[in-house]
Amino acid sequence: MAIIDDARKGIITDEMKKISLIEKISPEKVRKRIVEGKIMLIRNEKYPSKKIVAIGKGLTTKVNINIGTSSEVVNLDMELEKVKIANKWGDTLMDLSTGGDLDLIRREIIKHSELPVGTVPVYQVFIESFKHKSGGAYFTEDDLLNTIEKHLKDGVAFMTIHAGLTKDLAIRALKSNRIIPIVSRGGDMIAGWMIHNNSENPYRKNWDYILEMFKQYDAVISLGDALRPGATGDAHDEFQIGELLETARLVKSALEKGVQVMVEGPGHVPLNEIAWDVKLMKKLTGGVPYYVLGPLPIDVGAPYDHIASAIGAAIASASGADLLCYLTPAEHLSLPTVEQVEEGAIAYRIAAHAGDIVKLGKKVRNWDDVVSYYRGKLEWEKMISSLIDPERAMKVYTQFGKPKVRACTMCGGYCPMMWAMEQVRKISD
């Protein structure tokens, strides 16, 4: 039975109890917020992942790791190494592959992932249409629906569905003076299909049937933002907001049918607009979980977009965003390496925690207080073992050899904490 249906009947399931323990929130709050659509369990009921992951109101901010091949670089072994990184640092994982045997790659990623896995089904149907029909926009509506069903049968837990994009919005955005008309790959594929076939969005036309499929597997619909801003100068224009309004209507219908749903957000957004972007989305959708890409507050940061976007991500998290989609140093430049995936993942783990200190307060800040206590006492092993990345921290601590004094090699014998402890002893005598 779908978890929303259980919650509506007043049933607190084992999954709800586990979420309650992990997140330090009462089981009844979990149940009630699932009913309201404000908390969701990211899963495919028939193929549950090893890690239980819930997102939403009152829960810690989660981090999504994107991996996948491209038409230029197809290396399954490398992508499976990225899965290991995702298992270590992430909460959810998306396979965005566009090159190679897409069915094989997806199934191998799901097999090796401990996390719920997401996909963008239009990628596969567009690419296969391009290969077999000499054009990406030649796929049929049945091709798209069959691909969604295949992904669900394989165990995909959530999918980006660009159902908020209308034909009118797409055409007006393409004709507009936007700096970059469309930057969403899946969104542009749907736009191209609508224009080529002179037809409305196939997701919208088949929305009720899509809801039935997701309900059958109790999987999650992630409503994509096809017209998200790809430049800070395009943020919050009529096209982004127009699509969000359409998306809000779809959220309501999904929840009415008992389908778990979240909304995807930008993108490139100036720093001063990030907080109210989150608040606007929550207001329009009734508070369903928000899954943001960054946001990236500048356009000039590559190859440091993992750093620039982590700044925006921390603000988004603090403002109420629930799932952060990471960026890597390769963003806007290249397919990322394994090392770049880990750099991005760590940056976003930090951003999520920084936001949670604001959003959730003491129950997450206790971790920081413990580290600070050990730091103040110069208890290095305890302090380092409590950090976000103990292994790397120890390497840095000993990079010039073990310190000759109790302090580290930065301050040495002039360490204020070492002196302060001695001063405390003197004034206490």
Curated annotation (Swiss-Prot):
[4Fe-4S] cluster binds at C408, C411, C415. It comes from the Archaea. It catalyses: 5-amino-1-(5-phospho-beta-D-ribosyl)imidazole + S-adenosyl-L-methionine = 4-amino-2-methyl-5-(phosphooxymethyl)pyrimidine + CO + 5'-deoxyadenosine + formate + L-methionine + 3 H(+). Pfam families: ThiC_Rad_SAM. Pathway: Cofactor biosynthesis; thiamine diphosphate biosynthesis. The keyword Phosphoprotein does not apply. Keywords: 4Fe-4S, Iron, Iron-sulfur, Lyase, Metal-binding, S-adenosyl-L-methionine, Thiamine biosynthesis, Zinc. GO terms for molecular function: 4 iron, 4 sulfur cluster binding; carbon-carbon lyase activity; zinc ion binding. Substrate binds at N66, M94, Y123, H162, S184, R185, G186, D225, A226, L227, R228, E264, Y291. Binds 1 [4Fe-4S] cluster per subunit. The cluster is coordinated with 3 cysteines and an exchangeable S-adenosyl-L-methionine. Its EC number is 4.1.99.17. Belongs to the ThiC family. HAMAP family: ThiC. This is Phosphomethylpyrimidine synthase. The lineage of its organism: Archaea, Thermoproteota, Thermoprotei, Sulfolobales, Sulfolobaceae.
